[in-house]
Amino acid sequence: MEMTFRWYGHDDQVTLENIRQIPGMKGIVTAIYDVPVGEVWSRERIHQLKQDVEASGLKLSVIESVPVHEDIKLGKPTRDHLIDNYIQTIKNLGAEGVNIVCYNFMPVFDWTRTDLAYVLPDGSNALIFDEEVAKKMDPVKGELSLPGWDSSYTKDEMKAIMDEYSKVDEEKLWEHLEYFIKRVIPAAEEAGVKMAIHPDDPPYSIFGLPRIITCKENLIRFVELYDSPNNGVTVCVGSYASDPNNDAVEMLKEMLKRNRVNFMHARNIRLTGKGKSFEESAHPTEYGSIDMYEVVKALHDANWEGPIRPDHGRMIWGETGRPGYGLFDRALGATYLHGLAEAVAKNAK
């Protein structure tokens, strides 16, 4: 597997030089963050991004992400033009030698947590999701803002888009996803780009919005929408495991068997036992609810050689910055995963 690390561009306090010094680090996962959603990423901008990354001695491994415009998810008449733009971006990425794109189909909100700096017993700060707190939150009132969210909405715009989604149930969202997939994947095949849909995080409905990339059955349904290795998935074990009904390792094995794992996010979470509430933990198995050794072993047993990255980290050793995306704990996670991979490989001999 190819160890990679999320980088938020030159405004990120975690620099490429920092990342390059992490043992075993090979690639960067990033995006172009200042192009409005729905517009085309030019080859010139992609080329510059690739040059910037490669100048640090790393590879531009994955784009995470090319966001999908809400009009596409809503199935509005404007979607065809927006999908045309999306396809052109995919073609431009392929032409510049960037061949994996992670994206999601979550309505309105990206990953969602209820506390960004919860203090764990060891004194570190972590992201958590409290199901009861989430039930009482009203996103229209702007009660919470997270790094993955589109912060450009006014309150009136947020109310309007939430009203539009009140008419979109899960089956209707499936229809819109299928429409998108059947247009984008043939172009991705021609461009040599593997698409990798990220799970909904957490993988169940929040704020009354439909969510569909949530469980094993829905993953199988998704990959069967279009039978191609280019129509693949990002297996984020931490996202899937945050629903107690999911077996994240079994879901990973199912997608590996189907040759659809195009990207991996490997992080741990600890289910608190209070409904679907969870805490994001340190990466090692003993701190969470996921057997991380079995995750890496499944990848090894399938001879999987794709990109993997440590995901959200705690804030430790006094570090501050973007919640979940500091340097120190993610670097620990990367070296832990690297060590697991070595142990699994040697035990297999």
Where in this protein do the model-derived segments appear?
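Glycine-rich, positively charged N-terminal anion/phosphate-binding segment
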Residues: 12, 22, 40-61
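Glycine-rich, proline-tolerant flexible connector loops at the mouths of alpha/beta enzymes
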Residues: 31-47, 109, 207
